[in-house]
Amino acid sequence: MGIRKPALSVGEARRLAAARPEMVQAHLPVATQNSALPQPPENPDQEDRRPAPAVAKRHPSADRQSMLTVDALSSTTAPEKIQVFLSARPPAPQVSKIYDNLILQYSPSKSLQMILRRALGDFEKMLADGSFRTAPKSYPIPQTASEKSIIVQTSRMFPVPLLEVARNHFDPLGLETARAFGHKLATAALASFFAGEKTTKR
């Protein structure tokens, strides 16, 4: 059997061996060559994007509570009031059963003051709803000299709007003095109270 002659000479084999690493390096996948390089972000805007700082959330319920509180306070603000000086005389006997019973325990002045306080409170409501226009303005008073001398004087803070209604009714021309107006107002309040007392009995 004859000896085969190598297909490559020694020199060609050395050149091939030297060129093989370059060929291997040249055929490496692109992904392998670039794996060591830093990858740029897919979106350039993401590079500078940082999470926004947390902002403390306000509780809407607390804000609503404060608004409701402010509204409640403003809605309950008391109207402006002005002091009115009042005077009245005791009723004649049998005009008011309540008064006749009170004078058995208290003086006529004290008894009338107790009733007048209640009567003025009721009369304010009548001024507000307009029912005072059809109410009586006076009541019988005692005719004896000793009883005629009795007069009760007091004062009361009246809401300005209601006071204007009373002035237009009892002093439409604006000519009455303050005390004369106060006497008319107190007398009308007592007259309405005494009339209501009789209606209740029925």
Swiss-Prot record:
Keywords noted in UniProt: Crown gall tumor, Plasmid
Single GO biological process annotation from the record: regulation of DNA-templated transcription
Disordered: annotated segments: 24-65
Short name of one Pfam family: VirC2
Keyword hit for Heme: no
The protein, known as: Protein virC2
Gene transcribed to yield this protein: virC2
